[in-house]
Amino acid sequence: MVMSELRWHTASPEDNKNSLKRDLLKSTPTSAREAAVHIMQNRYISRLSRSPSPLQSNASDCDDNNSSVGTSSDRCRSPLSPALSLSHQQAKRQLMSLQPHPAHHHHNPHHLNHLNHHQYKQEEDYDDANGGALNLTSDNSRHSTQSPSNSVKSATASPVPVISVPSPVPPMISPVLAPSGCGSTTPNSMAAAAAAAAAVASTMGSGISPLLALPGMSSPQAQLAAAGLGMNNPLLTGSLSPQDFAQFHQLLQQRQVALTQQFNSYMELLRSGSLGLAQDDPALTAQVAAAQFLMQSQLQALSQASQQLQALQKQQQRQVDEPLQLNHKMTQQPRSSTPHSIRSPIAIRSPASSPQQLHHHHHHPLQITPPSSAASLKLSGMLTPSTPTSGTQMSQGTTTPQPKTVASAAAARAAGEPSPEETTDLEELEQFAKTFKQRRIKLGFTQGDVGLAMGKLYGNDFSQTTISRFEALNLSFKNMCKLKPLLQKWLDDADRTIQATGGVFDPAALQATVSTPEIIGRRRKKRTSIETTIRGALEKAFLANQKPTSEEITQLADRLSMEKEVVRVWFCNRRQKEKRINPSLDSPTGADDDESSYMMH
């Protein structure tokens, strides 16, 4: 030993290296291991001090097969890695390089087997001394030339006891969570935890590209995503099929389940003491904290990947739905415009209308026109006898006539039946309304008196509102044509009465021709009061049918012991109330504008 030390100090470096190898073979296993560790410490410390910065080194240096092992590993080393941070394969290659070939020195088979066993024992002792071969090399440098698919395969092939989770950074978890044989936390383990945290932070922004490496994707875009493209890549926008999205979601769920299972199994190993760590050991606390930190990091990465995938799926769905909705709107516009023009009642309206009247027709802007000659000429072109209009329907007697549709009007014209619209001119109707108002005022009758008198004389009850709308030309053309003959008859009877009395109006003379003479001069009918129980029965009937027929009204009046006219008026008022409560439920025909407005209590 003394001679070898002298030769070490006096000989050249290559001679010293060869002599050191010979001394290592002659020494015991323990001394050989210590010498190997000492040599590698000196070599790597010296080379680490001479090696350039990782930022200045080229990635191609890591893959240079002609360079030495130490130089290649030093160039690819992370700045946080200590001098003794060797992987298992690198340590084995270093230890094997120090051993001479057994065939050059031994020819006995028994002695050869013993030497091989001795060499294997040295490798195991070195692994134990270094705490499971901590590998703290940078994850980015180790995977600079490795495809994402290969990294996923290597992650799925990792054993369960050591947390090697299939995640965007699969090789990063094993070094930190590898069980060490030492009883206290060493600076190497703290540096390993720091390197792992830095690697997690550097890989958080990579998205879900490493997670999507599925070999059996059904589209080229999915293969690009599996090859590592991010979700913001324009090639993936709006091009993935629903099957691809389902496969992506399934893969993310599988990765999350596998990550949780492996984390739980590793925590059970730590708590059970199978790794040789006591419950009060500080190293156990450090291992648990590191495992929880990495578990949360991976779960966060999976959550971000799932959110990005859902956002992409929603964006693609919107891009598909927008053209369909646009086409649907374009096809629905011409269909909806034509029936609206047919159903809209075209009426003449003056500014003197009451607010209640304007409320019923606020959705027809073309109806509000001043009663002038110019407006009459304009409306005369629209309100021709052939114009299919539908407006307010008058209640003739006890029947409720239905509005005449375009088809029924055409059938009536084909059959030769003259309709009121065909026999009445618009200008003539306007002139009659003006004359009727002047004559009524001259005779001293109110609008309410005219309505009640017409009900008793001709069997048709009209409200004051109906007479007012007729004079203001606020009724539909169809209803005005129906009301004109009745008002004309009332004016003729009033003129005959005046002529019979010598030019002086005598209401008694008009009463002589009326079957019920007490009706003339009488005001509006007294308000009808309905009991609570009867009102509840009427409400139930209204909810079942808002527009009952004449026979149904008769049956309901008989069952409640009420007059049929009272029941009919109550339904009319109840429909008007429903329109005020729910304007959207207003019928487009406006068939209830002329209904009687008796007040109910």
UniProtKB/Swiss-Prot annotation:
Residues 523-582 bind DNA. It is found in: Nucleus. It comes from the Eukaryota. GO terms for cellular component: nucleus. Initial expression in cellular blastoderm stage, then in ectodermal stripes during germband extension. Broad expression in the neuroectoderm followed by limitation to discrete subsets of CNS cells, and expression in specific PNS neurons and support cells. GO terms for molecular function: DNA-binding transcription activator activity, RNA polymerase II-specific; DNA-binding transcription factor activity, RNA polymerase II-specific; RNA polymerase II cis-regulatory region sequence-specific DNA binding; transcription cis-regulatory region binding. This is Protein nubbin.
